[in-house]
Amino acid sequence: MITIDFSKGLVPTIILDDHNGEVLMLAYMSEESYQKTVETGYTWFFSRSRNELWNKGATSGHTQKVKQIWTDCDNDTLLIRVNQTGPACHTGKKSCFFHLIKEGD
């Protein structure tokens, strides 16, 4: 079993759409929210602004059913592939990444 490195408190977590690989959002997980995610099969995060756990979609219904959980080479960043119900972003957009800053040639 791989041990995730929570020594710095929170772990950046990238959420991908399992159907097409699109990046949906970036959030942070505490050890407790990670355990809840593993146990329930739905994403749980730690809100830095509210200083509390939150279950993605609990209020909006826009849930994220976990399909796969990956870790990076240092075990301090997570990538989770999900089946997304509704938009992932609180703005109503499918992805939180919709502001293009620069486009290459």
Curated annotation (Swiss-Prot):
Q: Which GO terms describe its biological process?
A: L-histidine biosynthetic process
> Catalysed reaction(s)?
1-(5-phospho-beta-D-ribosyl)-5'-AMP + H2O = 1-(5-phospho-beta-D-ribosyl)-5-[(5-phospho-beta-D-ribosylamino)methylideneamino]imidazole-4-carboxamide
Q: Which UniProt keywords apply?
A: Amino-acid biosynthesis, Cytoplasm, Histidine biosynthesis, Hydrolase, Magnesium, Metal-binding, Zinc
Query: Do the record's keywords include Cytoplasm?
Result: yes
* Domain of life of the native organism: Bacteria
Cross-referenced InterPro entries, in alphabetical order? PRA-CH, PRib_AMP_CycHydrolase_dom, PRib_AMP_CycHydrolase_sf
Q: Name one GO cellular component term.
A: cytoplasm
EC number(s) stated in the UniProt entry for this protein? 3.5.4.19
Which GO MF terms are attached to this record?
magnesium ion binding; phosphoribosyl-AMP cyclohydrolase activity; zinc ion binding
Give the binding site residues for Mg(2+). Answer: 72, 74, 76
Cofactor binding comment, as recorded: Binds 1 Mg(2+) ion per subunit.
Chief localization: cytoplasm
Q: Where does Zn(2+) bind?
A: 73, 89, 96
Subcellular localization: Cytoplasm
Its cofactor is: Mg(2+); Zn(2+)
Its annotated pathway reads: Amino-acid biosynthesis; L-histidine biosynthesis; L-histidine from 5-phospho-alpha-D-ribose 1-diphosphate: step 3/9
Q: Which NCBIfam families match?
A: PRK00051.1
Q: Function of this protein?
A: Catalyzes the hydrolysis of the adenine ring of phosphoribosyl-AMP.
Q: Which family does it belong to?
A: Belongs to the PRA-CH family.
Complex formation: Homodimer.
- Kindly provide the name given to this protein in its UniProt entry: Phosphoribosyl-AMP cyclohydrolase
| Source species of the chain | Listeria welshimeri serovar 6b (strain ATCC 35897 / DSM 20650 / CCUG 15529 / CIP 8149 / NCTC 11857 / SLCC 5334 / V8)
Q: Which gene encodes it?
A: hisI
